[in-house]
Swiss-Prot record:
Protein name: Small ribosomal subunit protein uS14c
Subcellular location: Plastid, Chloroplast
Any one biological process term the GO annotation gives: translation
Subunit record text: Part of the 30S ribosomal subunit.
Gene: rps14
Species whose genome carries this gene: Platanus occidentalis (Sycamore)
InterPro entries hit by this protein: Ribosomal_uS14, Ribosomal_uS14_bac/plastid, Ribosomal_uS14_CS
Coiled coil: none
Function (record text): Binds 16S rRNA, required for the assembly of 30S particles.
Amino acid sequence: MAKKSLIQREKKRQKLEQKYHLIRRSSKKEISKIPSLSGKWEIHGKLQSLPRNSAATRLHRRCFSTGRPRANYRDFGLSGHILREMVHACLLPGATRSSW
């Protein structure tokens, strides 16, 4: 189980990303449209003034049940070992154990 503080930090990052998403996207579009270098530097400065944690690259997917940050499957939102346990217990519909 991940520390609760790390999970809360990730939730805070998600809120910041949602809050500044439109500002960030519009600034990036403006940079591509402006031909002058000085104008690009000005808009780049605005981007730099936004909070660091509001960037989408700072977000990290976590396991829904344990909060584990590694080996997550997007389809289920679970980490690998929890996914395996749930499939073995027949708790995930449509997921079957592989056999060959």
